[in-house]
Amino acid sequence: MRKIIGFRTLCVGLGIWVGTVGVSAQGEFKALPWSQSTAYNSYLMRDVHRQFADRQSAIQQAFASPAGMQEYLEGCRERYKQIVGTFPEKGNLNAQVVGKVQGTGYHIEKIIFESKPGRYVTVHLYMPENMTVPVPATLELCGHGLNGKGSSSHAAMLMASNGIAVLVVDPIGQGERLQLIDREGKPLTRGATTEHTLLNAGFNLLGTSLAAQEYWDNHRALDYLLTRKDIDPEHIGVYGSSGGGTQTAYYIGLDPRVKVAAICSFFSTRERTMELQGPSDGCQHIPYEGREQLEVPDFALMMAPRPLLILSGKYDFVDLWGAQQGFAELQQCYKVLGVPEKVDMLTVETGHGLGAEKRQKLVSWFKRWLKDDQSPVKKAEQERFQLSDMLCTTKGQVNVSMPGALSIMQENVNQLDEWASKREAFLSKGKKTVQAKMLDLLGLKGLPDHKIRIEATGHDSMREYEQYKFQLIREGEMPVPCILIMPSRANADSPIELRLQEEGKGTYLSEYANFAAALTEGKILLLADLRGLGETTDPAFYTDAKYWNREYRNAMVSMHIGRPIMGQRVVDILTLLDFCSEHEFLKGHSVKVFANGIYGPAAIHAAYLDERISSVEIKHSMKTWKEYIERPMQWDMYSNVLYGALKYYDLPDLIRLSNCPIRFAD
C-alpha cells in the first residue's frame, strides 16, 4: 500500500490532520471543511437574484418609451406562453343550470359545465335582478379555502347588488372538485394547498402545471358566461384573493376579453418572497419563471393598459415591501403608456384576505370601469345560505356524482398512455437526440466541461482500511463531499462501489455491518452526499410538512431558476466519476453505482449519459414516473420532477436503452 502511505505523508505535509480514531462519532464522516446548514439554498438563491437583476435591467430600459414598454410586455407574454404549456381544443361545454337560490336583489344559479370531456367544473352565478340586460360580469377566482365557492361570497353579493354579475368558480382541489378523496367523497389531505401541491407534480411531468389547468378552467368559465344573452361580452372583469389572486395574475395576461381586474393578497415580488418565506404551494408556481425572467409584477403588467387594482394588507404574510416595489413598476408602466389613472393600489390596516374595506374599493373600481359609474357603492345584505343548499352536485363532489367524470389522476394517465407512440418515435431517433433533450430537461446546457479540483480534507487509519475525505469542486457547482474507503485487501481488480445513500453517508458508515463484507472482499467504497442531502441537508423547519417533501423549498427554487434538482445531482454524479477517473488510487477501476431513495432517478440518468458506470443497483426508489401520476399521495416527488419529461421518455425507457445493466434490488 505504498500509494496510501505516500498520500498520508502528503496530507501531513499539507497540514491536514491525520489520525486513527473510532467510527462511532457522526462528525467523523463530515468531509466538507465548513458547516453551513442553509448553504445549498443560498447557492440557489444566487441564481434567483441574478435572474431578477437581469429582469430589472430590462424593465428599466423598457420604461424609456411607449414602444419599449410594449415590446417588453409582448416579450413577457411570449415567454409566458412558452412555459405555460399547451391547452386542449375547445369542445362543447355541456352546461347545466341545476338549481337556483334567491337572494335580496339577486339570485344565485348553480351551474355545472365541462371544461374538457370528463372534467366537470362547478360554479355559482350571482345574477343581479331588476337590471337592464345584458349586464357586465366578472369571474371571482377562489382563494385556498377547502370549500371553494362555498355557501356564499360577500364580494359577489356586493357586486351583484351593484349591478355586476359574478361567476364564482371552484378550482381543482376545492369545493366540489376535490381529487384526493375516499369513496364517500371525503378529503384525504388536510387542505387545498396540500392537494394542489401533490397534483402539481404529476402535471409538471406532463409539461403543464396546476396553475395552467386552473387557467384553462377559468377560461372556459368565461366562455360559458359569454354564451349567455344576459351577459355583456364587452364588459368583463376578473378578480381574486390569495390563491384567487394567483389565478387572476396568471389569467389576465393571456385573455384579452378581460377589461378590468383586481389582485388581492398575492401581489409581491417572487424574488423577495422566495428569500423571506420560500416557495408557496404547487398552484402558485409555473416552472422556469425565473429562467425566463418573469416576475409576479410581469404577470400583472401584461394587463396594461387595461384597468388593474392591487389590494394589500399592511400585516399580510404576503410581503408588502415587495408589493410596493411591484406597484411602482405598474405605475411607471401605465404612465409610460399614457393611462396612469388605470392602475391603483389600496393598502389597509389589516392582514390577509378580501375584507370589507377592500371589497368596497373592489366594487367601486369595477363599477367605474365596467359601468362608467362612480356613484357610491350600494350596501348589500350579508345573507347566509346553508352549504347543503348551495351544492351543484348530488353527493357534494363531481367525481362521485357525475356520470363519466374523470379524476385528474385518470386524465393524466390517459394523456400519458396517449403519448406512448410519440415517446417510442422520439426514442428511436438515437442516443444523440435523446441525450440532447435529456440535458435540456435536466437544465444542463451540456455535459459539464469544467475540470474538477480535488481537495483532501482528512484521513483516518483503521485496522482494515484507510479512510480519506475529500471535497470535489467544479466551477459553478456545489462542492461534493465524499469519503473514500480503501480496504487493505484492495488490488488492481477491485471494483469501486459508489454509494449514494439518501440518509447520508455518515448514517451508512456509522454502522460497520453495512460495509464489513465489502472490506472482506477488497471492494473500494466511495460514499458521497449529493447536494441538498447529507452534509448540505436543508433544516427541516424551512419546509412546511404539508408539502410532503423534505426539500420542497430547494426543489421548487431549482425548478424556478430552470435547474431541476435532479439535474444538479446528475452533475454531482458526473463529478464523482471524474474523481474516479483522475485520482491515482482509483484510475482504471470499474465503477458500480448503488443508490437508494431520492437518488434512484438521478443514478438512472447518469448511467444513460456516462458509460464509465459499469452497473447500477437501486433500492427503495421509484421505478416509473407513472407512479406519481397514478398515486400522487407520495413523499418527496418534487426531488425527481423534470418539466415535461413524460412527453419524451419514462425511467423504464432509460433503463432499457442504457449501456450498462440497471436493476432494482427490491
Predicted regions and their residues:
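Primarily recognizes the serine-hydrolase "nucleophile elbow" in alpha/beta-hydrolase
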Residues: R220-E292, L576-Y648, P652-R656
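Catalytic-domain carbohydrate-binding cleft regions of carbohydrate-active enzymes
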Residues: H235, Y239-S242, T248-I252, R257, ...
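Bacterial N-terminal signal peptides that target proteins for export
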Residues: M1-C11
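Generic beta-strand/beta-sheet core signal
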Residues: Y126, L141, V169, Y239-S241, ...
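Bacterial N-terminal signal peptides
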Residues: T9-T20
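Cap/lid segment of the alpha/beta-hydrolase catalytic domain
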Residues: T132-T227, S268-P279, H285, N491-H583, ...
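Alpha/beta-hydrolase-fold serine-hydrolase catalytic core, especially in secreted/extracellular enzymes
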Residues: S24-Y120, A304, L308-P481, I485-E497, ...
